[in-house]
Design a protein with these regions (language model features):
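Phosphate/dinucleotide-binding and metal-coordinating scaffold of catalytic cores
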Residues: 1-233
């Protein structure tokens, strides 16, 4: 079987700081494989283990409602296609990926400051894709979870709208009630509200990360190791 031995050079960035040079090469099955070339810093993203796993974890899981169709529609189901289309951007942090010879900077791609694609936001929520042209990037490709959700940029900030199960829709109510308890225990907890979006009950919360503050999940901090309550405290 003939296969291409070409390789594409990429750079893992943190805003405008180059962190890692790496390359992608296709194997005999035309599957992309990623290889580290040179780190420019002793620091690593929290939870970083292997490059391939790190990049895969930046992509929305296929089990998230409506997302697999979106990934396929825009050529993001392939790991390298995901990098080229989305730059592995996320609203969790300020890491991103560019091709080594691309004249891009953080200001060009930041999800915190640039417009979102409304078409993709709506498709991520209800599964209806009305256009195939990706004119602007979207945080939907890098948002995990199970139920349908989407990000909306409003006058007062960026908000996450989350729906629930198709039959009972109790999950938004559960999140709203849990937030009331959380605010009693911790006044700095993220506030949740309820509402309707595209005729569905949703929970709504503001984005709590920024270009200065990121989100690191406990699974990344502890790298999957079990911890007891006393150890956590």
């Amino acid at each position: 079987m003939a296969f291409s031995n070409s390789r594409t050079q990429y750079v893992l960035m943190n805003r405008d700081v180059s962190m890692l040079e790496f390359h992608c090469q296709r194997n005999e099955f035309d599957e992309p494989e990623f290889f580290e070339d040179a780190w420019h810093t002793p620091l690593r993203p929290i939870g970083y283990g292997r490059l391939t796993a790190f990049l895969e974890q930046r992509k929305a899981p296929k089990h998230r409602k409506h997302i697999q169709q979106l990934l396929e529609q825009y050529g993001c189901d392939d790991p390298e296609g995901f990098l080229r289309v989305t730059h592995a951007l996320s609203l969790n942090d300020t890491f991103w990926v560019r091709e080594a010879d691309a004249a891009l900077c953080w200001e060009d791609v930041s999800l915190y400051t640039n417009p979102f694609s409304e078409i993709i936001s709506e498709a991520a929520f209800d599964g209806i894709i009305s256009e195939t042209d990706l004119s602007s990037t979207s945080p939907e490709f890098g948002t995990d979870g199970y139920y349908a959700k989407c990000w909306k940029r409003e006058d007062c900030g960026i908000y996450l709208y989350k729906s629930g199960s198709a039959h009972y829709e109790i999950e938004p109510l559960s999140e709203y009630l849990a937030a009331q308890l959380s605010n009693r225990l911790c006044p700095g907890a993220v506030p949740y509200d309820m509402g309707f979006y595209r005729d569905k009950l949703v929970s709504k919360c503001p984005l709590f990360t920024s270009e200065a503050i990121g989100l690191a999940k406990a699974s990344a901090v502890f790298r999957g190791e079990e911890r007891t309550i006393p150890e956590l405290l």
